[in-house]
């Protein structure tokens, strides 16, 4: 109501914008996980514009994907719920959503999730230890699969053998 808006403004609160979810189930065929169902009624309507006018991740990501003609998105399984929400955003823009694939997250040698606190396993940390980029890419191409580790010389070689159906569901150890 107008009274509520004025009250909030007088308290110094500024408005933010949310994307209204449908409350329906968002169903999609994931390239790695198979059929995925995200129940948007169990999610809060995502904030898309902060009080300061800055945008949050989901909506700009969707718009960028539309503008760039992105057809496939492969990302960590921690983004499955985001994908269900983003599918609704694509639909609201009158666009088809890309094809999604969500891979298990990598863990360290102890089975713990990677963290920013472990700088030794960061790209910079590996570079500082003189690891060759293609050696890292070669290893990464086989983690979480039954594929033997090979020494590849180009990303094209890796993309030629990459088969998402061979990815396991358990976290890969690095």
What are these regions (language model features)?
Residues 81, 93-174:
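Catalytic adenosine-cofactor/nucleotide-binding cores of aminoacyl-tRNA synthetases and other
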Residues 1-80, 86-87, 93-99:
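NTP-dependent nucleotidyl-transfer catalytic core
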